[in-house]
């Protein structure tokens, strides 16, 4: 909008759109509802922030195929959840054209969807990739940090345990991961919307962060800092890990996006600011 673009927000009406936008109310899971809300509108670019399943992707592909010249879907680093690589993972490690799609899985079951988040995104990517004429981009987003409205509570999880002296559950071999700041991914999506490339692209700041480095940044933010607090880790079995701890190594290589022209920041440089943004005065 700051650049003079007209922005249309489509949601179910449960939350108000930003001021100055055009607001359409529709259920994206209902193809007729979406078609009716859109009418004859067309768009230069569609940015899909809430596509979690292949069923949703099928509907979106049919509805927007004749309505947009570019479709940008926010995907996730979790499409690589089965990788375990000593090197940062490139986009070709998961080729959406080779991913099997199963529309009969219980994608409408919230519990199933929660435990199959990465699989849902993989199959959604595959639906878009199956149509060679559909101009899609899937932005595989690293773990996001920063901002004052983190509804996940993942950094709070660590801060509370550090303050209480409670052990933090991690895998016996705990791998580092790639991250991106919330403002950086917003900039990336805006950049991707205006480019011409297609297909999957990784979005991650330069460098990896360990669970220990996250905890060190949190400790520095606590009153008294490292002189009063220290993170304690406890190795546990699969299924009990704390957030941002990983038994497999699948940090993302950002070389493709860099070659295409996007300039990433360095995770270690923005991490202290991200901690301050998210925790604010809550730890005082």
Where do the model's predicted regions map?
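Glycine-rich "substrate-gating" loop/helix at the edge of Rossmann-like oxidoreductase active sites
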Residues: 114, 142-152, 172-183
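Amphipathic terminal alpha-helices
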Residues: 265-284
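Conserved C-terminal active-site "lid" loop/helix of NAD(P)H-dependent oxidoreductases
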Residues: 182, 212, 237-264
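Conserved Rossmann-fold NAD(P)-dependent oxidoreductase catalytic core, especially the SDR/UDP-sugar
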Residues: 59-120, 137
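NAD(P)H-binding glycine-rich loop region in Rossmannoid oxidoreductase-like domains
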Residues: 13-68, 73, 79-82
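Conserved beta-loop-beta element that borders a ligand/cofactor-binding pocket
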Residues: 122-148
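Alpha-helical substrate-binding/gating segment
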Residues: 159-169, 175-209
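Mid/C-terminal beta-alpha module of Rossmann-like enzyme folds, strongest
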Residues: 188-242, 283
């Amino acid at each position: 909008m700051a650049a003079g673009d007209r922005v249309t927000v489509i949601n179910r009406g449960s939350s108000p759109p930003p001021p100055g936008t055009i607001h359409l109310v529709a259920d994206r899971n209902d193809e007729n509802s979406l078609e009716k809300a859109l009418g004859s509108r067309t768009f230069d670019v569609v940015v899909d922030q809430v596509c979690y399943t292949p069923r949703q992707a099928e509907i979106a592909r049919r509805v927007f195929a004749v309505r947009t010249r570019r479709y940008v879907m926010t995907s996730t680093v979790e499409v690589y959840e089965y990788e375990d690589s000593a090197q940062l993972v490139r986009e070709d490690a998961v080729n959406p054209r080779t991913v099997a799609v199963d529309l009969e899985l219980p994608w409408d079951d919230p519990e199933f969807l929660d435990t199959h988040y990465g699989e849902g995104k993989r199959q959604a990517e595959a639906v878009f990739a199956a149509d060679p004429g559909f101009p899609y981009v899937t932005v595989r987003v690293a773990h996001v940090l920063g901002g004052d409205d983190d509804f996940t509570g993942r950094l709070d999880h660590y801060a509370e345990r550090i303050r209480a002296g409670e052990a933090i559950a991690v895998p016996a071999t705990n791998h580092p991961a790639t991250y991106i700041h919330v403002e950086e991914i917003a900039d990336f999506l805006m950049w991707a919307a205006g480019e011409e490339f297609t297909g999957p692209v990784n979005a991650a700041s330069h460098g990896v962060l360990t669970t220990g480095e996250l905890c060190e940044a949190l400790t520095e933010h606590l009153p008294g800092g490292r002189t009063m607090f220290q993170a304690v880790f406890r190795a546990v079995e699969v299924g009990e890990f704390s957030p941002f701890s990983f038994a497999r190594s699948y940090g993302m290589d950002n070389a493709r996006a860099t070659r295409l022209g996007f300039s990433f920041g360095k995770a270690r440089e923005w991490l202290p600011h991200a901690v301050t943004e998210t925790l604010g005065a809550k730890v005082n």
